[in-house]
A protein has these predicted regions:
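Short, flexible helix-loop junctions that flank or precede catalytic/ligand sites
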Residues: 1-315
Length: 315
């Protein structure tokens, strides 16, 4: 299916940008994304944000996640999109897709009426403003699974963008609600593969107890540090995923460095995490080369007739 992304006039002529959207929704396994996404989409409640730049495959990954839920769980999936991209058919779930301008007058009106339609899972096409963000958090706190996209470079930048929607007076209440309602922020970038085509590099921030406390305090730099030091259980940074793909020869080192948030951090991981077994063997070889003394014999001139040659054995 071909979708017109944008139509415009230039130099007196008509121009357009088209997007090719496949009819068949890909599976999560075929996209080379973390297996964790298979379980995240089956959650009963919470807010899951998919963030990244334009054209990084956010919509494709979200569609694959929704199809996973559609195939495995009975329920009602409601999408409010501008425009509709992937088309779903009912499987274990009933999927209703509403397009802004065609099925609902505006995104806000569609969201206002969403709870009356008894959804279990709600997909919001994109969060661009405070009103949409407030609705997404509110629905997550009321027991629904909410999915949406945002434009941000990574997880902690997404947190900063969410905060920027609100006035300083409203931010403490927002942070408390976000800490309680957020389930995960998934960031994605498309990287050229050595075998051709592109593969996603994925950062996952899970809202663990530690991350929740840091969000409530507004300490977003602390969230970044917790992820880098693997203190946020289940989370992974771009550098961790890029290092994995470089090690498995899925991408080149130069390509990984170009897409890393911190090339220095990625180089450190490649040097220290790639071959832990070889480092252990190297240490063992070094220890084998060192001189060892298992038996020491002391031959002492006896100043006292009672003094004798002593033999000391060390084990």
């Amino acid at each position: 299916m071909v979708s017109v992304s944008s139509g415009f006039k230039q130099r007196g002529s008509i121009a357009a940008v088209f997007r090719c959207i496949p009819f068949d929704i890909p599976s999560l396994d075929s996209l080379n994304v973390p297996p964790l996404l298979n379980t995240l989409i089956l959650e009963k409640r919470g807010l899951i944000l998919m963030v990244g730049a334009t054209g990084t495959g956010k919509s494709t990954t979200l569609a694959a996640m929704l199809e996973q839920r559609n195939q495995q769980l009975a329920g009602h999936i409601l999408t409010i999109e501008d425009p509709i991209e992937f088309l779903f058919s009912n499987k274990k779930s009933v999927v209703n897709q509403r397009e802004v301008g065609r099925d609902t007058q505006s995104l806000q009106i569609g969201l206002k009426n969403a709870l009356r339609q008894a959804p279990d899972c709600i997909l919001i096409g994109e969060i661009r403003d405070r009103e949409t963000m407030t609705s997404a958090i509110s629905y997550a706190l009321s027991g629904h699974l909410v999915l949406s996209t945002m434009h941000a470079n990574n997880s902690y930048h997404a947190l900063g963008r969410i905060l920027s929607f609100y006035t300083p007076e409203a931010r403490p209440a927002l942070l408390a609600d976000l800490a309680a309602g957020l389930r995960s922020i998934v960031s994605q970038r498309l990287v050229r593969a050595t075998a051709g085509g592109r593969v996603p590099a994925v950062e996952v921030m899970l809202n663990t107890k530690l991350v929740s406390e840091l969000i409530e305090q507004g300490d977003f730099s602390g969230v970044k540090e917790a992820m880098e030091k693997s203190m946020a259980e289940g989370s992974q940074t771009f550098e961790q995923d890029l290092a994995r793909m470089i090690t498995q020869n899925i991408i080149t080192r130069d390509e990984g460095l170009a897409f890393a948030d911190s090339p220095t951090n990625l180089m450190w991981r490649l040097q220290n995490d790639m071959n832990p077994i070889s480092r252990v063997n190297a240490k063992k070889e070094e220890s084998d080369d060192q001189p060892t003394f298992t038996e020491i014999t002391l031959d002492v001139r006896p100043d006292n007739p009672s003094t004798r040659s002593a033999s000391l054995t060390r084990y």
